[in-house]
């Protein structure tokens, strides 16, 4: 036979989390986000997938691209013409790394 506290404690915890705690947190919530002055921040975060300026950054079911690195794709599309062009390209890459 199951002991009485093994039934009562889970039942009380369920009632607390589902009914009592949400009501109490409306009036007293020490975990609410606050600004530097201690005022409660009412505004939630913006939805990251809003269409601004007529352009949607996220299109569900849009084009799926393969995971190919950009450097490999650029080299295969635009191969260097000669050794001088290749040397100049490596110098530019090295200067970018130094900065």
Swiss-Prot record:
Pfam families linked: DUF4512
Taxonomic source organism: Drosophila melanogaster (Fruit fly)
Acidic residues: compositionally biased ranges: 68-77
InterPro entries the UniProt entry points to: UPF0729_C18orf32-like
Protein name: UPF0729 protein CG18508
Keyword presence, Phosphoprotein: yes
Keyword Phosphoprotein found: yes
Similarity comment text for this entry: Belongs to the UPF0729 family.
Highest rank taxon of the organism: Eukaryota
């Amino acid at each position: 036979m199951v002991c009485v506290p093994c039934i009562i404690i889970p039942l009380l915890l369920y009632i607390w989390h589902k009914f009592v705690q949400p009501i109490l947190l409306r009036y007293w919530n020490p975990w609410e986000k606050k600004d530097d002055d201690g005022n409660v921040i009412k505004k939630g975060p913006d939805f990251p997938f809003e269409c601004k300026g007529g352009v949607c950054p996220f299109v569900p079911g849009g084009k799926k691209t393969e995971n190919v690195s950009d450097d490999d794709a650029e080299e295969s599309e635009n191969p260097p013409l000669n050794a001088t062009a290749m040397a100049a390209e490596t110098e530019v890459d090295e200067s970018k790394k130094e900065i």
